[in-house]
Amino acid sequence: RFYATQLSSTQLRRADGLNRQGIEAMSFATDYYSNNYPVELLSLATKPANDFQVWYEWKFCYTIIHACNDAIANLHKADMSANKLARYQCEARFLRAWAYNRLNMLYQGVPVYLEPINNEDCTRGQSSVDEVWQVILDDLTYCINNPDFPNNTLNEDYGRPSKGAAYALRGMVSVSYTHLRA
C-alpha cells in the first residue's frame, strides 16, 4: 500500500536531482511536485510547525513507523514459515529505518518508538540525532545479517526491500551521519 499510494503520486519536476524518486528529491536540491502542487524543499526552507509539508512529512513517516512496529511485534502470530517471518521482519525494519532516516534528515532528532503504542502514548521527547542514527543503523544491520533476507529482489518480488537496498540505505545514512558530524 505504501508503494502504491504514496510514492506513485510524487514525481520529479526536472531531471537534475541526485536520484529518480521524487520523495527522496526533497532531501536534496531538486524541485518536485506532488499531484501537480509545487512545493518548496523542506530541507532548504524555514517553515512553521503547522505548515502542510511539515505536518505531512511527520505524519507520513510516523504512519510507516507505527505500522512497522506493529508488524514487528505481531507477525509471529500469523501462520507462516520461519523463513517468511524473518523476511517480513526484515522488510518492516528496513521501512522503519527508511522513515527514521527521512525524519532525522529533515528534523535533526525525533522521538523514537520501537514498539506499538496507542495515540495517547505518543508523548516521548526528542531523541538526539546520534540516537536516531543508531536506531537506523541497528535496523539495517539486522536486515543485512539476516540469512532469510534476499540479496536482491530484481527478478522476483520486484520492488520489495532486500539486502542490496539495506546496504545502499546504510551507506547513505553513514555518509549523512559523517557529513553532519563534521
Predicted regions and their residues:
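Short acidic-aromatic linear motifs embedded in glycine-rich loops, typified by GG[WY][YF]DAGD(H)
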Residues: 1-91, 95-134, 150-153
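Active-site catalytic microenvironments for nucleophilic, acid-base chemistry
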Residues: 74, 176-177
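Amphipathic alpha-helical protein-interaction segments enriched in hydrophobic
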Residues: 158-169
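Conserved small/polar residues in nucleotide/adenosyl-binding loops
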Residues: 178-182
